[in-house]
Amino acid sequence: MTKEPIYSPRMLHRDPDSPRPVLPTQLTSSTLRCSQFQTNVFCLRERDLLERFTSEVAQLQGRGESREFSFLLSHQLAEDLGKAFTEKAMLQTILDAEAKLPTGSVKDVLGLVRSMYALISLEEDPSLLRYGYLSQDNVGDVRREVSKLCGELRPHALALVTSFGIPDSFLSPIAFNWVEANTWSSV
């Protein structure tokens, strides 16, 4: 009986034989907000983690460990890979929705939300530094850009929350009147 491969290269959404995306060393605001850069960094991270995971599992199996125990020993890579796959799928869903919108303010706001999602995902993922996808300076650039995006999204915050259709009873009082929620009488 032949062993089934741990994964199929077809699991990758991109052609596994295609060249790896190359990330710029200097990250500008426009680069960080570029959907192609965001797609490239998410695909590079997923592809590299998949290769690392399969290599580690294969090495452990080569030393006589069972496939199941090899998976257990590789849990950190498996966790990072699962997160990378999910975040890439979410980014692609946002990009697909954004592509269907006509040019205008809604598309512009969705672009800001997409950039916020992508950059927060990158900012909060320690595997980006652990495996060298981004430098410490790059992570600092990402953090600064997230702050800028927060400022740009602030005027749209109420409309964004309303667009999700969340019932008022599920929202904190601060969502309705920030000034009233933070007065001394209510604190």
Swiss-Prot record:
GO cellular component labels: cytosol; peroxisome
Keywords linked to the UniProt accession: Fatty acid metabolism, Lipid metabolism, Oxidoreductase
Pfam family, one: ACOX
GO BP annotation list: fatty acid beta-oxidation
GO MF annotation list: acyl-CoA oxidase activity; FAD binding
Spans annotated as Disordered: 1-21
Keyword Oxidoreductase: yes
Highest taxon, organism lineage: Eukaryota
Top-tier EC class: oxidoreductase
Entry EC number(s): 1.3.3.6
Alphabetical list of InterPro entries matching this protein: Acyl-CoA_oxidase, Acyl-CoA_oxidase_C, AcylCo_DH-like_C
Leader peptide range in chain numbering: none
Enzymatic reactions: a 2,3-saturated acyl-CoA + O2 = a (2E)-enoyl-CoA + H2O2
Protein family membership: Belongs to the acyl-CoA oxidase family.
UniProt-recorded name of the protein: Putative acyl-coenzyme A oxidase At3g06690
Organism field: Arabidopsis thaliana (Mouse-ear cress)
